[in-house]
Amino acid sequence: MVKESAHFAFYSDEAISEADLNLAVQTLENTVWENLFNSNLLMPEPFFNTADKFKPSIHIHSTDGLSAGGWASNRVGMWIGPGALKDHWGLTHEFTHAWQYWWGFNGGLGCPDANTCGWIAESHANYTPHQLPEYRSEVHCSEMLGNAPHLYLGSSRDRYCNWQFMEYLKDKQCPSAVNQIFTTAGPDPFTNLQKSRGWTLSQLNDFFGDWAMHNVVWDYKSTPEGFRSAYGNITQTDRAERMRRLMPLEALDASWATNRRFVSPYFGSPQRFGYNVVRLYPASGASTVTVKFRGVDQPGSDADFRWGLVATNSQFSSARYSALQRGLDANLTFRVNAGEPLFLVVTATPSVFKTIVADQAYGSIWRYRYMVELANAWPQGFQNGQRDACASGTVRHANGGGCAPTSTPASVFVGPYATILPGGNASGTARIEDQAIIANGSVTGGTVGGLSIIGETGSPWGNHAFNVSGSAQVRTTFYPLGFFEANQAASGTLNLYGDVEYRGAGLNLGAGSRSGFVDSTSQVSSPTDINSTARPAWRP
């Protein structure tokens, strides 16, 4: 041991300067410990309820980076390099892991081998540094949740980046409500939240439905401007990864212009505690809008929903809310004012809790489709009772009816809801289906569908093109292919399906079915999907 403070013991097998040791003490005592335990979050200290107290061990070594955890029920600590002693965010994040580890061995949240809660360890460890005054406007990677809200909450794809619900829980309840997710015994953070709050499952579902509605303008008590400034507003599509903030509906049948009935997309319908935000356009002069909602209950899915309408100001900085709606069938009439943007928010809240484990196969997770019938309003894509005009530089393509540049060959199929933007192109017998967007790259063969976005645009980190060739099948639902690294492609007989995170510079896979985290070492998976492709039928 080379130094000791009120709450920490410092160790090193190297010569550490007194200045560096004093910096370590100052940071860990006055920033980390103070904000986690003495004020702000008021988390219960490790060993607070034990007769024997052990100071966390801080191991400093030049080859260490920044990590934390423990090695016994009464031993927690951190392993850090000298350069990390100035990193307040990193130290808070990692010491949060040490705290989580202690609770896992002392009656709190514990992850089974199936791993139902590994994601929240990282998400919570990004939530805690955001509470430090110096980081109140630092949102880190949390934009991911708002860019792909249809994925289940707790997805492995954004496991560091989905902590906004903890911020809202802190607002609505108190900081201890977040702490109790970890201090309550149980294997799943959501059931721990329910248990610690004394809620029924219906009340837990209410919380997530209410939270989703407030995410339209990030209507939180604490630092909402930080979220709004970093994310931009919900309608922004200036970057390819922001093109799925709003979920466009599809016509339920050919009579949509008269019956005004629409359905959520097969791939875009929300998973458990995921949500859709749908832009609605009130008819000119309308004083109210009516929504008839009909949820789709697939056998075994235990479908249930929370939904409502949200009207915002033109700056997307304040909102009015309808009452939260529940169940498979409900009708809502809501007052509207001229000039107010209007949104339908639908959250998947199954009536029987659905456990999802880390990296669970995409096709084994329920997606909760729903239908709506509208009065005095049209959804995005169908304004004023007709299909919306195509984006600049594109027109309706004769083969399929979607939007594409005029140079697109007639042999290319572009489905009615698909788009080829001017930065992308397709040729040969390529098929662009469903809600797919070709933003930056080429498709010379195969099929691109689902919610796939091909190529990155508008990015400060590089606008990477992505290419699809051969007979590849690409139907993805997460971030744009090409977002993470450059020079990537899908070729041959490759089948990319669902929540794909395609990783590795120059990656070009040519065979097998893959979903989830996909790199050069990924195992081939099954594309089987439990969700029915049958078009739902309206019910009165």
Predicted regions and their residues:
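Zn2+-dependent metallopeptidase catalytic core
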Residues: M1-R75, W79-F95, W99-W103, T288-K292, ...
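Zinc-dependent metallopeptidase catalytic helix centered on the HExxH motif
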Residues: S73-C141
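Active-site-proximal alpha-helical
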Residues: M144-K221
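Extended, small-residue-rich solenoid/repeat segments and analogous flexible loops
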Residues: W378-A439
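Surface-exposed patches in mature extracellular/periplasmic domains of secreted proteins
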Residues: F37-H59, G107-G118, S137-E143, S176-T184
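Residues at the loop-to-beta-strand transition
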Residues: V412, A418, G424, A430, ...
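Beta/coil-rich, acidic/histidine-enriched accessory regions frequently appended to metallopeptidases
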Residues: P189-A389
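Extracytoplasmic/secreted proteins, especially bacterial periplasmic and envelope-associated proteins
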Residues: L23, T27, T31, K86, ...
